[in-house]
Amino acid sequence: MVMMKKMKGSQSFRQRLLLSTLSSTPISIDEIRADETIPGLRPHEVNLLRLLEIVTDDAVVDINETGTRLKYKPGTIVGGKNLVHSCSLSRSIGYYLEPLLLLGLFGKKPLSIRLKGITNDPRDASVDTFRSTTLNIIKRFGVPAEDLELKIEARGVAPNGGGEVLLTVPNIKTLSAVHWVEEGMVKKIRGTTFSTRVTSDFEHSMRFAARGIFNNLLPDVHIFQDHRAGAQAGKSPGYGISLAAETTTGCFISADTTVSCERPDETGELDVEKKERSPAEDTGVEVASWLLQEIEKGGVVDSTHQGLLFLLCALSEQDVSKVRVGTLSPYAVETLRNIKEFLGVKFAIKPDPLTGTVILKCTGSGLINLSRKLS
């Protein structure tokens, strides 16, 4: 019988649930935003619990009346085909994709799930970044490429969403350990601009501005357009850009953002601070510059993917993984703490003063998918 882990506070909520499920460790979390004006779990957190109930069997979720206390007993990860889930509109689909990817790998059956909601927002990684970068990082750990896919069937920006994606994830027996420390040189940049319920002129402006930043540095730059209309454009107007640099050693570094064009008077409940919208050219320049900053930081992944990289290393076979990253992000540091707490895996961390990067080594926990159906 595994003892229930007792925790406090709302931090790392998504990761705690993910690691609790993968390690079959029941958890109780107290004092969830107990002192805030609106206490308890947020809509997207309750929604994530519902999603876990869809992809697992026999999970037990117990939330008190105020939402400030949660008991979670994880079930068996089953996966399954033709699943559908409507995500909360308080976070984008990107919030749900990272845990789903990892859970899907260790399921009883391959996972095929349709997620509905917001596909692109400034807070979470966009669905474009998942396609261009996240999936490529996961393939590095021995996951077969042919069964790992994310299709964007409709776009949806805040506040009303209306987007739809189809995620398919294969089952694996175990993740391979990696020795991944060479960043290589950037050989090409690929990107996507999109627009929904607004003129495609926004896309032209972003592409032109972003290319202007890269053209002096690299000849191989292609930014594709994805203008959506009708049902495929979701329920709110907006536009955005996602960029990914690929290096000579197969690293992918990404940056993206989204601008929602919904007028303040059309939405009663948006508590986001309203600010003057900058021109689309500025958005293109901003994301291109951000991508260059991420490349300059060094490391085999960008700062938004450090946490995922460490999770993959910690979940892999009982062999040594060695990776290089830029300056550790706060989320990455928190991830290392959660990994130690749930999986008992400790990373040796060694700064490399010559490059300003950090090299991390760990022995994987050797998580094996025992429930996988052998074909």
Curated annotation (Swiss-Prot):
Query: What compartments host this protein?
Result: Nucleus, Nucleolus
Kindly give the SUPFAM superfamilies that the UniProt entry links to this protein: EPT/RTPC-like
Instruction: Give the PROSITE patterns listed for this entry.
Output: RTC
Q: Which UniProt keywords apply?
A: Nucleus, Ribosome biogenesis
Question: Which GO BP terms apply?
Answer: ribosome biogenesis; RNA processing
| Entry's Gene Ontology molecular function annotations | catalytic activity
Q: Which Gene3D superfamilies does the protein's record reference?
A: RNA 3'-terminal phosphate cyclase domain, RNA 3'-terminal phosphate cyclase, insert domain
Q: What is its main location?
A: nucleus
Cellular component terms (Gene Ontology): nucleolus
Give the family this protein belongs to, as stated in its UniProt record. Answer: Belongs to the RNA 3'-terminal cyclase family. Type 2 subfamily.
Quote the NCBIfam families the UniProt record gives. 18S_RNA_Rcl1p
What name goes with this protein? Probable RNA 3'-terminal phosphate cyclase-like protein
